[in-house]
Amino acid sequence: QYKPAIVRGNASEIIALAGLWGLEGEAADLSRVRGVDTTDTVDAARDAAVALARYTGGAVVVSGEVDLITDGTTVAKSHGGSPLMSKITGCGCSQGGVLAVYACAADPFTAAVCGTAVYNVAGTRAAAVADAPASFKVAFIDELYRATAQDIADNQLELEEA
């Protein structure tokens, strides 16, 4: 009866979830999850993400080197972040909290795009001043705090039809 406004996961998680909900047929069997890590690519999860977004009527975020965000009609790709983000336990999970904050103030797709952009901006800036996981984590939190609406607007974003 109640469907999520925003779903966020790595490529393998999104493919598996679409499979569990019967949206992608064999996709869940093809997904390669290793704990919370993924061996699937963001591009491989595109169809599953679009199907999930159409099913929920919300937005889906697939995190990766270039994040994919879709509402089932439009696909956005958000650039930025840092490879160090994958070295921080819970970094992907905490993105869910950031997305939830934005979801309180905007429609699901806009919230997902803005929340992902601010995450990528913070990751890029933190990587410029930190070169190891512990210092990166502190710098990342500081950069989330410092991010502005203009930073979100300046984040590199590609848009295409789903």
Task: Give short role names for the model-derived ranges.
Residues 1-75:
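Conserved phosphate/ATP/ADP-binding segment of small-molecule kinases
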Residues 70, 74-80, 115-131, 136:
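Glycine-rich phosphate/pyrophosphate-binding loop at beta-loop-alpha junctions
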Residues 19-22, 116, 145:
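A generic structural signal for secondary-structure junctions
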Residues 78-89:
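Short pre-catalytic strand/loop immediately N-terminal to key active-site residues, enriched for Gly-Thr
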Residues 48-53, 108-123, 140-141:
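Short, well-structured alpha-helical segments that form the helix of a local strand-helix-strand
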Residues 121-162:
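Charged C-terminal helix
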Residues 8-11, 42-46, 93, 109, ...:
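Electropositive phosphate-/nucleotide-binding environments in soluble metabolic enzymes
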Residues 16, 87-117:
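Short, small-residue alpha-helix embedded
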